[in-house]
């Protein structure tokens, strides 16, 4: 078994032992028993997982507290997405959130010609030059984590003379029932705000203002 498989199995066992906040009091000996490894090997894996940012570790009178980070959870959800792809299982992801103001960055990025050409070719739309920003409700964060694990529709990044624009993945969705696309960087950014694009100005189309609740339905 290679190291990456050991890391995945260890995070899975920590998750199984954890509470709803992804925290578990686990000694290296107990984790060793769960993994069928030596105590020394389990201790090394815990140290490695912490160094790689998959978990955080604190020691108190109660013992060693292991907390799975967003990066660690992503490892689990990516495996879920891969199995879903192999088994041809479609995931219906429903998230709720509220409309929040943007910083103008969406318009800047969406208006790049290299992106627009790909949106037209791969998504079949020329998008309105701006994004609808939705702050995902805490109750929907597990669904957002699940979505991050899927590959979506690949939008290639590119370079200009003065900067690099990263690759993006897009997912067909419905925003309050209106066909649209949820986009996110392929390089994971841990945020609870998602961006929606459409060929329509969604704020006008859906009569939305900041603070209004929105439901996003994605088929991944």
From Swiss-Prot:
Binding-site residues, FMN: 188, 195
Record text on cofactor binding: Binds 1 Mg(2+) ion per subunit.
Known cofactor(s): Mg(2+)
Keyword Metal-binding: yes
Pathway, per record: Cofactor biosynthesis; FMN biosynthesis; FMN from riboflavin (CTP route): step 1/1
GO BP field: FMN biosynthetic process; riboflavin biosynthetic process
Residues at which Mg(2+) binds: 131, 133
Cited function: Catalyzes the CTP-dependent phosphorylation of riboflavin (vitamin B2) to form flavin mononucleotide (FMN).
The protein's name in its UniProt record: Riboflavin kinase
Native organism: Thermoplasma volcanium (strain ATCC 51530 / DSM 4299 / JCM 9571 / NBRC 15438 / GSS1)
Lineage: Archaea, Methanobacteriati, Thermoplasmatota, Thermoplasmata, Thermoplasmatales
